Amino acid sequence: MSRGIDGTFFEIHHHNTAEGKYWNPALDSFTAENWREKVREIAALKMEYIVVMATALYDRCYFESSVFPLADIPCADPIEAVLDEADKCGIKVFLGNGFYGDWTKPGVNITSGEVIDRSFKAMDELTEKYAHHSSFYGWYFPDETCIILRFSGDFMKYVNLCSARCHEITPDKKTLIAPYGTNLTLTNSKYIDALASLDVDFIAYQDEIGVKKTRVWQSERIFERLKKAHDKAGRAALWADIELFKFEGMVYKSALLPADFKRIERQIANVAPYADKIIGYQYIGLMNPEDSGSFAGHESSVELYRQYAEYLKK
């Protein structure tokens, strides 16, 4: 069997309105059964992980919370629907501890005491509501900042602070980050030292091919360098976050469409020798079975689903 994608990011609503053109309207009408069907579809492709990117967006929560009002969507508790179905499917779920500030300002969010306090309060509530689920595997910190040569001091402080909170309230849960700026990493001794002092279990670097910061032929060498650095640091496991999309027009300012599968196949092959796990961004909106009762995305998402399902049979 071909090396596949081990998991996927998962969103209740895409944060960038232009990018989510083809699936936000569908997601906004989803019932609990629609969310459950999406989890079953992901499980059918043998994926092991779901990363719920955001548990709040635009000052609204996707669960009953004292932090923000409940989002105005048909499903009153999509987090419960996802976790409960994941329990049945044997999928491991990471819950995002954002966005409890403006998602466009991660530099503010990781340094603002007010935003961090809100996220910690939400984490307490998420733990109280959902810790009984066997599928609740860990936490994802979505306020990512760009790696410029190495992780910034502010970002490292933020990650370690969040991880300390996770250890306190859910000592059995794992932690995940998925930084960008992967093509800018300088994996020298300073980078290795930073990795060694970063308290996180998994780092899923964005391959940045969909956003055109990295060309397909470059990603293998980048991940080879990162693997050597991670091995020397001896702490966080190296994962890959591969982008399954292309843009309809301008990068970041137009709709996301499913990428050509030949490109995605190369992306998988490039990182597979180095990454312990491969997470795709993302199943939601970019892949749909033809007969899905919970279709969300462009019609071309059917073809990407078909091609990927066939690839898994090789």
Regions found by a protein language model. Give the residues of each.
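Catalytic domains of carbohydrate-active enzymes, especially glycoside hydrolases
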Residues: R3, D28-Y58, A196-I203, N270-I278
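Hydrophobic faces of well-ordered beta-strands that scaffold small-molecule active sites
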Residues: I5-I12, I50-V52, V93-N97, Y137, ...
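Acidic-and-aromatic substrate-binding clefts and catalytic sites of carbohydrate-active enzymes
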Residues: N16, P25-N34, I42, A54-C61, ...
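Aromatic-lined substrate-binding rim segments of carbohydrate-active enzymes
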Residues: A32-G101, D154-T175, Q218-K232
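An active-site-proximal structural segment forming one wall of the substrate-binding cleft
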Residues: K38-E41, L45, I73-C89, V108-G138, ...
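Substrate-binding cleft of secreted/luminal carbohydrate-active enzymes
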Residues: Y49-V51, D207-K212, A233-K314
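Active-site groove signature of glycoside hydrolases
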Residues: G98-K105, A122-G153, I278-I279
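Aromatic- and acid-rich polysaccharide-binding/catalytic face
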Residues: S134-D143, I147, N188-W217, Y283
